[in-house]
Amino acid sequence: MKYQANTRRRALEYEKALIEFWKKNQTFEKSIEQRDIDNSYVFYDGPPFITGMPHHGTLLSSVTKDAVPRFWTMRGKRVERRWGWDCHGLPAENFVEKQLGITDRREIGTKWPLATYIEKAKASMVANSEAWESTIERIGRWVDFRGAYRTMDKNYMESVWWAFKTLYEKGLIFEGRKVLMYDTKFSTPVSKA
């Protein structure tokens, strides 16, 4: 792909042309396939909440998360970049409750059947995925959306429980006390990101 200096071509045109070039030539896929699996660099990328649209903060961290795998790829490592969606926690619950107009958690199971709440939550988890994919592509980040995982999927949850059980059996889990921020609406600690 050639660019001419001193042209008035707009950045958006270059962006679209470059993305099309990468897709047509399967540049990202080849950057993985052409490297030996025994020469891997594993990069764990904490997934974003699917409940919100991409914004400055998520994009800033996303660009940083793209730099590390690209560095190791350029050093000859095979770096698979599997995308994921965080579908659990307060952001997901707040998102669904806002959509349903729930103002009191006691409405779940009374005014709103639990099955309805869960189905609405599952449907909501895919609502913003297209906007995310488009935005991540436009900032030039290379990730595998086709093999994306969701924290609400049974296989994912079972793997987490398996890992927890393994840690417990090795005596690495303990009960303790710690001061945390607290969400008074949901009566639960707020995770520290």
Task: Please provide the spans of the model-predicted regions.
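N-terminal, positively charged nucleic-acid-binding surface of large information/translation enzymes
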Residues: 1-193
